[in-house]
Amino acid sequence: MTKHLVIPDTQVKPGNPIEHLRWAGQYAVDKKPDVIVHIGDHWDMPALSSYDSGTRNFEGRRYSNDIEAGIQGMEAFLEPIRAEQQRLIRNKDKRWNPRMVFTLGNHEYRIERAVNADPKLDGLIGFKDLKLEEMGWEVYDFLEPVIIDDIAYSHYFTSGVMGRPVSSAKLMLQKKYMSCVMGHVQDRDVAFARKADGTNMLGLFAGIFYQHDEDYLTPQT
């Protein structure tokens, strides 16, 4: 049986703390999973947000700063992993090279939306700026599920023709009929079900993994 480590939404942006990502990397070293899945929204990309465009909070945001902040956060996560891999090589111990999978989230997809809205940006900005492949990640498009050990991973799973996210882990199992893990929402949620052949299914909303408070959250969220 393989071991999976899931990193939910990290939403790195300029000025926010990232030391918890190094802790997560050290946790990966301690547990040595076979697969590491980042469920997306690692880059918050506030400079491309349409949510508060035109407000005072929007002033001073820069695309390049957003990209660099996310890269620094990812490097913090990967630093302990790379150090452990080099240690194993030096000591001639059993190698550990986990499969690393990144499912693009709606925040990363802001880059694509910006290009679609302004074709002059085509070739100037793009997912290549994230350098995910260079850092060793397999990258899957926004909402493209990747199936690993009979578990479907995606930034979120949709319900109905409108493409809106499912509202609960239980509904996710009812809609997709297989084990699924998603991020996107702040809440954690878990559900279990069993197929007619006795196969167990797991539905998981993985929650979030950042230290800061988002402005759009209320005291009840």
Predicted regions, residues:
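A short acidic (Asp/Glu
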Residues: N16-P17, P46-S50, I111-N116, R164-P165, ...
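Beta-strand-turn-beta hairpins that frame and shape the catalytic cleft
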Residues: M1-L5, P145-A152
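N-terminal active-site segment of His-dependent metallophosphoesterases
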Residues: M1-E75, R82
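Core alpha/beta structural scaffold of self-assembling particle/tube/pore-forming proteins
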Residues: Y109-E112, L121-L130, I151-Y156, G160-K170
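Hydrophobic/aromatic residues located in beta-strands of well-ordered beta-sheets
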Residues: I36, M100-F102, G203
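Active-site metal-binding loops of divalent metal-dependent hydrolases
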Residues: P8-Q11, G40-W43, N106-E108, Y156-T158, ...
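Active-site neighborhood of divalent metal-dependent phosphoester bond hydrolases
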Residues: L48-Y140
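Conserved beta-sheet core of the metallophosphoesterase superfamily
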Residues: S154-T221
